[in-house]
Design a protein with these regions (language model features):
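A cross-family phosphate/adenosyl-ligand binding-site feature
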Residues: 1-296
Length: 296
């Protein structure tokens, strides 16, 4: 017989906290009509795990791909699909710290870039641009579409939005498509954008993992270090907004894709990578957590 799960102190809507990087940040998760909308309940939960208070705005086309109840459950609040007497797109009484448009469709991107505000979503984003212009909020968009729609019109619209202070999150490009990035990647971009940490923008070098020394063409001396500590340090710095570079000794653990990293397969490679980084003079600080070989 399958046993029942152990009891939990969490309610059905609660999430297990991963960090406080988005603590006390009000985030408008703006869901437009791309197929990637089906992933947004998990995205909302991820943002909440980092401390965000998330309100979902969904277009009618988005609700073809994701259920309104699923978004309401994942955000633990009602989904806004229409504008009423409260003028939800203005959010004057309780303004948002950031607007994350994910997925951002071709149609939505081009409408917002040209100032069209003829739907609840585009009206919300017109207001968001006004708040960005006043340095009151941040606007991030994650473009998703088939590669054939990635044309000059789209490029010019994205450049226009960037010139207005919008952060364009690079898509995960696979199989001829601009795909929505992984949830942790989106959470990282959001955290870095809203961060007020003194580490924001600082260049920091981190090392981690083993540095094997070859005995011959087959055997080598190494240790049990995995590099988890170095990855954890680099990830924390990344979420705080630092420009972090990680040199990771080859092990069974791979750093997340959003971290700028190099893999060192030997002590000699590690030494060369570290010295090259330090000689560049671009780093404000360095944290050395690698298990450097001491048996040469």
């Amino acid at each position: 017989m399958l046993p029942a799960p152990p009891p939990s102190s969490l309610s059905d809507h609660d999430v297990v906290k991963l960090s406080t990087h988005l603590e006390n940040k009000r985030v408008a998760l703006v869901v437009t009509g791309g197929i990637a909308a089906y992933r947004t309940p998990d995205l909302a939960r991820t943002l909440r795990r980092h401390g965000a208070e998330v309100t979902a705005f969904a277009s009618s086309d988005a609700l073809r791909y994701v259920a309104e109840d699923a978004l309401a459950w994942s955000t633990n609040r009602a989904v806004i699909t229409q504008l009423g007497y409260e003028a939800e797109h203005l959010s004057d009484a309780n303004p948002f710290d950031a607007y994350l448009v994910a997925p951002a469709t071709y149609n939505t991107i081009n409408k917002v870039a040209t100032g069209i505000a003829d739907t609840p979503i585009t009206a919300l984003l017109a207001s968001a641009l006004g708040r960005v212009d006043r340095n009151e909020a941040h606007l991030l968009i994650a473009p998703t579409m088939h590669g054939t729609m990635h044309n000059q019109i789209l490029i010019e619209s994205l450049e226009r939005l960037e010139s207005l202070g919008t952060t364009v999150i690079p898509p995960r490009q696979e199989n001829g498509k601009d795909n929505i990035p992984d949830h942790e990647v989106l959470a990282g971009w959001l955290s870095r954008t809203v961060s007020d940490s003194p580490l924001k923008g600082k260049r920091i070098l981190v090392t981690g993992g083993p540095t094997p020394v070859a005995i011959d063409g087959i055997r080598r001396l190494t240790n049990k270090f995995t590099g988890r500590l170095g990855i954890a340090i680099a990830t924390e710095l990344y979420f705080r907004g630092a420009a972090v570079s990680l040199i990771h000794g080859s092990s069974g653990i791979t750093p997340p894709s959003y971290l700028d990293h190099q893999i060192a397969t030997s002590f000699d490679e590690y030494q060369t990578m570290v010295l090259n980084k330090l000689e560049s003079g671009e780093f404000k600080a360095a944290i050395f957590s690698a298990a450097v070989a001491d048996y040469r």
